[in-house]
Amino acid sequence: MGPLSAPPCTEHIKWKGLLLTALLLNFWNLPTTAQVMIEAQPPKVSEGKDVLLLVHNLPQNLTGYIWYKGQIRDLYHYITSYVVDGQIIIYGPAYSGRETVYSNASLLIQNVTREDAGSYTLHIIKRGDGTRGVTGYFTFTLYLETPKPSISSSNLNPREAMETVILTCNPETPDASYLWWMNGQSLPMTHRMQLSETNRTLFLFGVTKYTAGPYECEIWNSGSASRSDPVTLNLLHGPDLPRIFPSVTSYYSGENLDLSCFANSNPPAQYSWTINGKFQLSGQKLFIPQITPKHNGLYACSARNSATGEESSTSLTIRVIAPPGLGTFAFNNPT
């Protein structure tokens, strides 16, 4: 068997991305000393680039060969053929204008698109006894390298336990499968989750802090896989019951009263203070210098979340007493 002739102009092809996986099939009644093989150059090619299907170990004394799109060898799937005698190239209905067949049976596909993914069949015809040719078939499958996916969300800011969120893995990729990850692990399905039939869409019912993410999606096929960047839902919640610091309730007359209020909330809560039911100020802190018994009373802090519309409050009873040694008179008659 003579050496394989190199296809012309292959040195000008720039390679990247799209994976081709070859499934070798035995040739029917085709006696050869070596198995005909096909090599994808490059092994990976991205959409818009070129790929060469380089054929090795061609038998001698060939009449010609035909390339088909798919595994059905009919006129509709006929791409192109090469007739050895006369070096004639014939194009069929499946020819897109981007395919070039060479004298060594190799096929160049330029500007690869997603429609190019799938099976291809090479039909080799060997000279027989002058009346019949001996044929053989070689089929391989071309897989598009999966693009890096991204996650879109129907609502990135859901209210806790109240709203449903729909996450979608993009783009929609033919002949690909979808996987989901949460917190870096395979998705732990719960009664609050549901996947679409294709697994491309994830439904989250009544999102809680345990199901807020981060989420990742992965697109994979038999040739490659790619995972998205993580997406974490900004869960709107609260406010929880506020806490007043310090929780001291007794003060000496003349001390400063310096109170702070905090409630767990997203977004951060808005605070207001009342003393004995009367509004005092807005803000997280309440400061009164040199308090006296007239400042005795019920100090209440209210926290409100404008995003959830929820409000919560807590209170503290403050009692101001005379400093040690001044006695009851000083307490009842402050100066």
From Swiss-Prot:
Cysteine pairings via disulfide bonds: C169-C217, C261-C301
PROSITE patterns given in the database record: IG_LIKE
Secretion signal, residue range per the UniProt entry: 1-34
Keyword entries, A-Z: Disulfide bond, Glycoprotein, Immunoglobulin domain, Repeat, Secreted, Signal
Keyword presence, Repeat: yes
Gene Ontology CC, one term: extracellular region
Localization annotation: Secreted
Domain Ig-like V-type, residue spans: 35-144
Residues carrying a glycan: N61, N104, N111
A UniProt-annotated Pfam family: V-set
Domain Ig-like C2-type per the UniProt entry, residue ranges: 147-234, 242-317
GO biological processes: female pregnancy; heterophilic cell-cell adhesion via plasma membrane cell adhesion molecules
Sequence motif Cell attachment site, residues: 127-129
SUPFAM superfamilies: Immunoglobulin (SSF48726)
PANTHER family associated with the record: CARCINOEMBRYONIC ANTIGEN-RELATED CELL ADHESION MOLECULE 19, IG-LIKE DOMAIN-CONTAINING PROTEIN
Recorded family membership: Belongs to the immunoglobulin superfamily. CEA family.
Protein name, entry field: Pregnancy-specific beta-1-glycoprotein 11
Gene source species: Homo sapiens (Human)
Name of encoding gene: PSG11
